[in-house]
């Protein structure tokens, strides 16, 4: 409790505009809680990143845990936090928000950085891994599980060759008390015991098995599994576990691979990669948490401390130069995070006839909206619709980009299916409509052979356009 009260005391209630000017149009990126903007300290003209959250207990917990960890050189620093009322253009009145001023990270995300280095070597991958591991160790020594370790949350300080990499976004971090029952995950980075915890949790809720006094839980070791996946992708350019069918939920074949730890080191990409690197991956991707390397074991591993040159150029750099590949790995998987989480709080829905929300009341009176009609769209109440629309577009990218188990009619049919869903939720998008027309789309499927990489790249542009449009409302 004292930590929470100390954190509350550190939050300023004066207006942030007294000390900072905010560029509301320049966005550094978009996370699950909205875009990160640029702000400038008036007294020094120094640029910082500004994250804005609704002032709720969950947001205060995120700030508290991040502040606890932020003293480490490989974790993004929090400069200061303001509690102000902010009214965005789409809102009828101001709302209490936390404005988190953080150090500016100019060097970009991990995969973007790798894509810019045509000669990204195994030694560089080892050095990046060591920095990530040091950040994790700091969190774990404080008994904090990050629970969201993925490439998008690993940022470089600047564009210099020796720029440090730093861990950010503590939105799903928790104190590890052995009771982390709510699985939080992105499919390609999810540990097997997270899936087992989810399976048992769902069965208990359904009354299939009695609730155990000592429920199956998962803990900090899941961060280490995620680290193993990130190392694998850094080394070769694709994830160790993937599915023959791509969707926003984890298919059975992918779930089976994760639960059994079934992955390989294909000769084409891995022949020049050291046995030390393969060894650390194997030891991190152990299915049983007790057999997995600890964070100290990672830091002591020969691969992170080798005096060998390890100057072999990795295939990942070449693969990630293709924007469509990066889109496939990052957008179709990691950016699906917000839509794939099982929320910590249970949500109960009121019957429509008793709802007080004026937007929903109006929709009820209007009934089903006619095709191509215009209807009132509220930014917050419409966020779920927008998320679904973006999900469907990301499913198209996943189907286009990820390795296919087989070619031919089945894969073509699957692409047609995911595109039908994407079109259903994005009919108003002119760019998508024009794209489908140019790709010979007849409303049910593509009549000509599709250049999947080109389609993925255009759909990525559609996502960016739709995201920008929704944020400006």
UniProtKB/Swiss-Prot annotation:
GO BP: cellular senescence; negative regulation of TOR signaling; positive regulation of dendritic spine development; positive regulation of telomere maintenance; positive regulation of transcription by RNA polymerase II; protein autophosphorylation; Ras protein signal transduction; regulation of signal transduction by p53 class mediator
**Keywords attached to this entry:** ATP-binding, Coiled coil, Cytoplasm, Kinase, Nucleotide-binding, Nucleus, Phosphoprotein, Serine/threonine-protein kinase, Transferase, Tumor suppressor
Q: Which residues form the Protein kinase domain?
A: 22-304
Substituting residue 337 to G results in: Induces constitutive protein kinase activity
Query: Could you list the residue ranges forming a coiled coil in this record?
Result: 409-440
Its transmembrane ranges are: none
PTM-bearing positions, type Phosphothreonine: 182
- Recount the known activity regulation: Activated following phosphorylation at Thr-182 by p38-alpha/MAPK14, p38-beta/MAPK11, ERK2/MAPK1, ERK3/MAPK6, and ERK4/MAPK4. Activated by stress-related extracellular stimuli; such as H(2)O(2), arsenite, anisomycin TNF alpha and also PMA and the calcium ionophore A23187; but to a lesser extent. In vitro, activated by SQSTM1. Inhibited by diterpenoid alkaloid noroxoaconitine.
Q: How does it assemble?
A: Interacts with ERK3/MAPK6 and ERK4/MAPK4 (via FRIEDE motif); the interaction is direct. Interacts with YWHAE; the interaction prevents phosphorylation of HSP27/HSPB1 leading to disrupt F-actin polymerization. Interacts with SQSTM1.
Which PANTHER family does the UniProt record give? Answer: SERINE/THREONINE-PROTEIN KINASE (PTHR24349)
What name does this protein carry? MAP kinase-activated protein kinase 5
This chain is encoded by the gene named: MAPKAPK5
């Amino acid at each position: 409790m004292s930590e929470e009260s100390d954190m509350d005391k550190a939050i300023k209630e004066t207006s942030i505009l007294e000390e900072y000017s905010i560029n509301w149009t320049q966005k550094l990126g978009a996370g699950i809680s909205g875009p990160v903007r640029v702000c400038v300290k008036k007294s020094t003209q120094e640029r910082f990143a500004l994250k804005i959250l609704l002032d709720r207990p969950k947001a205060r917990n995120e700030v508290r845990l991040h502040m606890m960890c932020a003293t480490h050189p490989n974790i993004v620093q929090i400069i200061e936090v303001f509690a102000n009322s902010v009214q965005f253009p789409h809102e009828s009145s101001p709302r209490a928000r936390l404005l988190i001023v953080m150090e500016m990270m100019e060097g970009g995300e991990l995969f973007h950085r790798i894509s810019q280095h045509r000669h990204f070597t195994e030694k560089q991958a080892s050095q990046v891994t060591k920095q990530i591991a040091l950040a994790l160790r700091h969190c774990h020594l404080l008994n904090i599980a990050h629970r969201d370790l993925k490439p998008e949350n690993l940022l470089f300080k600047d564009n210099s060759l020796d720029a440090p990499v730093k861990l950010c976004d503590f939105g799903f971090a928790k104190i590890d008390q052995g009771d982390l029952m709510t699985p939080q995950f992105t499919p390609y980075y999810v540990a097997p015991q997270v899936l087992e915890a989810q399976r048992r949790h769902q069965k208990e809720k359904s009354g299939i098995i009695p609730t155990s006094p000592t429920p199956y839980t998962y803990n900090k070791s899941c961060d280490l599994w995620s680290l193993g996946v990130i190392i694998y992708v850094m080394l070769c350019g694709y994830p160790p576990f993937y599915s023959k069918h791509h969707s926003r939920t984890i298919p059975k074949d992918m779930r089976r691979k994760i639960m059994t730890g079934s992955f390989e080191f294909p000769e084409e990409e891995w022949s020049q990669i050291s046995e030390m690197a393969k060894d650390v991956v194997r030891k991190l991707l152990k299915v049983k948490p007790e057999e997995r390397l600890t964070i100290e074991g990672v830091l002591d591993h020969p691969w992170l401390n080798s005096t060998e040159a390890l100057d072999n150029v990795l295939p990942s750099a070449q693969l990630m130069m293709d924007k469509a590949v990066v889109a496939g790995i990052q957008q179709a998987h990691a950016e699906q995070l917000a839509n794939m989480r099982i929320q910590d709080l249970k949500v109960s829905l009121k019957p429509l006839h008793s709802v007080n929300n004026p937007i929903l009341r109006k929709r009820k009176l209007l009934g089903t909206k006619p095709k191509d009609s215009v209807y009132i769209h509220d930014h917050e109440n419409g966020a779920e619709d927008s998320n679904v629309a973006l999900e469907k577009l990301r499913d198209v990218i996943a189907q286009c980009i990820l390795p296919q188990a087989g070619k031919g009619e089945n894969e073509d049919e699957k692409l047609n299916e995911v595109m039908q869903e994407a079109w259903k939720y994005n009919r108003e998008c002119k760019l998508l409509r024009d794209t489908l027309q140019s790709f010979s789309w007849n409303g049910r499927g593509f009549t000509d052979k599709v250049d999947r990489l080109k389609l993925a790249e255009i759909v990525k542009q559609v996502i960016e356009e739709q995201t920008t449009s929704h944020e400006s409302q």
